[in-house]
């Protein structure tokens, strides 16, 4: 797959919210080119946005237990879908089989039991992956890996002497004025 990479350090995990993609740059072996693995993701819905910035993977877990916050439980109950205070591993657990805990409290990178939410703003701020994609990343991503989250609806890249632009839908709650920013973006 060809994709224009986000404007971010090419190390560890990089998440582009607008593109709804995760990129993993494993440390290259001496003398070998840098590899990048990329997968589609689901991100935080309006009102539950995924934060931008830099953090690290502080824990890794297989068959995680989900302990939803009171606010998440309340929202589920209001929508006619009550959830328990503790959800054990298994097919009803929305975290799926694997999770990475981030240095930001309450934010995770994890699998899902509802794959239709990948590619959408469907979470309470966490980053969701298809079960097979989180399984692949879980085998590769070590504890302490740097995680950079950006929101770049417009990405640029050079390929064979030509400048390419890839545009994604601007997230509904993105406060930036992208019409004013067009000239600045194109000047770079």
Segments and roles (model prediction):
Residues 2-117, 136-143, 159, 165-188:
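Gly/Pro-biased beta-strand-loop elements
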Residues 56-59, 128, 149:
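Structural signal for conserved beta-strand scaffold positions within catalytic alpha/beta enzyme cores
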Residues 115-125:
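Short, basic/aromatic beta-hairpin or loop at an interaction surface
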Residues 123-138:
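Short beta-strand-centered segments at strand-helix junctions
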Residues 140-156:
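A short beta-strand-loop micro-motif that forms or neighbors metal/cofactor-
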């Amino acid at each position: 797959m060809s994709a224009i990479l986000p404007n971010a350090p090419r190390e560890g995990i990089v998440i582009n919210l607008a593109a709804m993609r995760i990129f993993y740059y494993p440390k290259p072996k001496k003398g070998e080119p840098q590899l990048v693995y990329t997968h589609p993701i689901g991100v935080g819905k309006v009102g539950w946005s995924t934060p931008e910035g830099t953090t690290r993977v502080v824990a890794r877990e297989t068959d995680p237990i989900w302990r939803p916050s009171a606010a998440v439980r309340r929202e589920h109950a209001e929508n006619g879908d009550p959830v328990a205070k503790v959800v054990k591993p298994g097919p009803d657990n929305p975290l799926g089989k694997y999770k990475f805990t981030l240095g930001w409290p309450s934010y995770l990178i994890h699998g899902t039991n509802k794959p239709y939410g990948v590619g959408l703003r469907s979470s309470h701020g966490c980053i969701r992956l298809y079960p097979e994609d989180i399984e692949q990343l879980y085998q590769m991503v070590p504890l302490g890996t740097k995680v950079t989250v950006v929101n770049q609806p417009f990405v640029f890249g050079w390929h064979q002497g030509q400048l390419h632009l890839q545009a994604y839908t601007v997230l509904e709650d993105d406060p930036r004025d992208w019409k004013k920013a067009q000239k600045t973006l194109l000047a770079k």
